From Swiss-Prot:
Keywords: Cytoplasm, Differentiation, Phosphoprotein, Spermatogenesis. GO terms for biological process: cell differentiation; chromatin organization; female gamete generation; male meiosis chromosome separation; meiosis I; RNA processing; spermatogenesis. This is Meiosis 1 arrest protein. It comes from Mus musculus. Its main location: cytoplasm. Seems to synergize with Cbfb and Myh11 during the onset of acute myeloid leukemia. It is found in: Cytoplasm. Residues 188-200 have a biased composition (Polar residues). Required for meiosis I progression during spermatogenesis. The modification Phosphoserine is found at residue 516.
Length: 529
């Protein structure tokens, strides 16, 4: 993708986690595939939002809006706050699920660009309305078009239809083509990303084409990518390699190596979700384990958080019982402020480090450089991390215990074989177990989705009543008087009676500018267990 500097990039690193871009999802409905896609899509969306609406700590997803495009484009859900709004999002998903029995026709080619233009207009009006009350206004959004049509055909349609549209407020425009076949899933199935053709350079925003399997798990993984920190204003971590960490030539003392890295979570901390962690009360900060390395890296606004490598270790030289907290992934930075040569050199050095560590069977022990404030004269405590290489272009980082944290313990080695009778009983029991080659977390469910959904299901008669009334259809036709967007949707063609409905529609839609009571309460209420 082309690296542009047209959108606002002034966000401080302290806001990286909490100021994620709004999301606009446009579902391009077409028969006959919609009948197969709809159940999987709706289940994946419900599972995703049960997590996204429940997460404590910094907000990972600010606003969300949903459009559908079939024989016309329609705003099913205007931009709303995600946190604390599960009931409203669930009603939207229920409405989306009903579309599978309405008889969908192949949408006209002009409707997708119209839906994007309509969503942009709604976003701009919402942003300008909320600019005075928001701590930091939203200046850009990400748009996803979900379709079962050939992806390249949709990309070409968007390139043609959007060439005269101002897309400076679009941070990313992606087309996700849902395929009918289900490919074999690995540990973390990820969508296949393809750049669009050269003609997309005429647009002010690049179009990214991805393919997505038509199953619930793949769609969940696709939507959960929205929870990642997507800011590229500044690299998160500086990994400092001292001469003692890797034995380079003697002249390396004059050329210290600093690898610039971005930080990525491997999974969500259970402490960020209500009713998890096996019922044990959390004595840590409500933000959970994210308050360690991830939070330190985000709060280092003046400069990236530094990890100073102290020494190398043999991979068998550390006991797993000494590591704690959430693991994190280090990868070469994609910071937009670095020039291409520096980015390429940094990635090559990172690749070489992974290769050398694997070849030598080494780990790295690193010290987190504390953030020393001028007004604090005492030396702050620091944390130590063990860094493990992988066969991909990533490093695994885990906290490791230090002397101050250790408790006495003596664990003698097994000195002799166990009694023969006990050995036979245990061996027979073990032989009855299923043996798997690997652990795949995507095949193991903990009923967390249903638990979180039930926790959100509180009686709200007014909302359910309005949802049910919106879902009614008359004579198999769509309701033409249903307008819930923050702006009046763009017409496909001029209609004589349209002007008569504009005033009423504008009044009805103005309420969408204001957050609901639950949204306001959620913003003001501090996170707690």
């Amino acid at each position: 993708m082309n690296r542009r500097k047209t959108t606002s990039r002034g966000t401080s690193a302290a806001m990286k986690i909490s100021h994620q871009p709004p999301r606009l999802l446009i579902v391009n409905i077409a028969v006959p595939s919609w009948v197969d896609i709809c159940p999987n899509l709706c289940e994946a969306l419900q599972n995703f939002f049960s997590i996204a609406c429940s997460l404590m700590g910094p907000s990972r997803m600010s606003l969300f809006s949903l459009y559908t495009v079939q024989n016309q484009h329609e705003c099913v859900l205007p931009f709303v706050q995600v946190r604390g709004n599960f009931i409203r999002l669930q009603a939207c998903i229920s409405e989306l699920r009903m579309l599978q029995v309405e008889g969908c026709h192949r949408p006209p080619h002009a409707l997708l660009p119209l839906a994007i233009e309509d969503g942009l207009q709604q976003f701009k009006q919402y942003s300008s309305h909320m600019a005075s009350s928001a701590a930091q206004p939203w200046t850009s959004l990400e748009i996803t078009v979900l379709t079962s049509r050939p992806g390249k055909e949709v990309v070409k349609e968007l390139e043609e239809g959007l060439k005269d549209i101002n897309l400076l407020s679009v941070r990313r425009l992606q087309v996700a083509e849902v395929t009918k076949g289900i490919q074999e899933r690995s540990d973390s199935p990820s969508p296949t990303e393809e750049p669009s053709n050269d003609e997309s350079s005429i647009l002010e925003a690049d179009i990214v084409l991805e393919t997505l399997d038509n199953d619930v798990v793949s769609m969940e993984v696709f939507f959960k990518a929205w929870l990642h920190n997507s800011e590229t204003d500044q690299e998160n971590i500086h990994l400092l390699l001292t001469p003692q960490s890797l034995p380079p030539p003697s002249r390396a003392k004059d050329h210290p190596i600093c690898l610039k890295c971005d930080l990525q979570e491997r999974f969500l901390s259970p402490s960020l979700l209500p009713g998890t962690a096996d019922g044990v009360s959390r004595i840590d900060d409500p933000k959970g384990d994210i308050s360690t390395l991830y939070q330190m890296a985000s709060l280092a606004s003046a400069s990236p958080y530094k990890l100073q490598v102290v020494k190398a270790l043999k991979s068998s030289g550390i006991c797993e019982s000494l590591t704690y907290g959430l693991p994190f992934i280090l990868r070469p930075t994609s910071c937009w402020q670095l020039d291409w040569d520096e980015l390429e050199t940094n990635q090559q050095h990172f690749h070489a480090l992974c290769h050398c560590l694997l070849k030598r069977d080494w780990l790295l022990l690193a010290r987190g450089e504390p953030l020393i404030h001028k007004h604090n004269q005492s030396l702050p405590a620091c944390s130590f991390y063990v860094i493990t290489p992988s066969h991909s272009l990533t490093l695994l980082v885990k906290l490791v215990a230090t002397r101050e944290l250790m408790l006495p313990g003596f664990f003698p080695l097994l000195s002799e074989d166990p009694p023969e009778d006990s050995l036979k009983i245990i061996e027979s029991t073990l032989d009855s177990l299923d043996l798997g080659l690997t652990y795949n977390p995507l095949h193991v469910g903990s009923h967390l989705y249903s638990h979180l959904s039930s926790a959100h299901a509180k009686p709200q008669g007014r909302l359910y009543t309005s949802c049910a009334s919106r879902g009614l259809r008359k004579g198999g036709q769509l309701q033409t008087n249903r307008v819930r967007a923050a702006v009046v949707p763009l017409p496909v063609a001029p209609a004589p009676r349209r002007a008569l409905k504009m005033t009423a529609a504008s009044k009805a839609s103005s309420a969408a500018f204001l957050p609901s009571d639950s949204e306001e309460g959620e913003e003001e209420r501090p996170s707690h267990t």
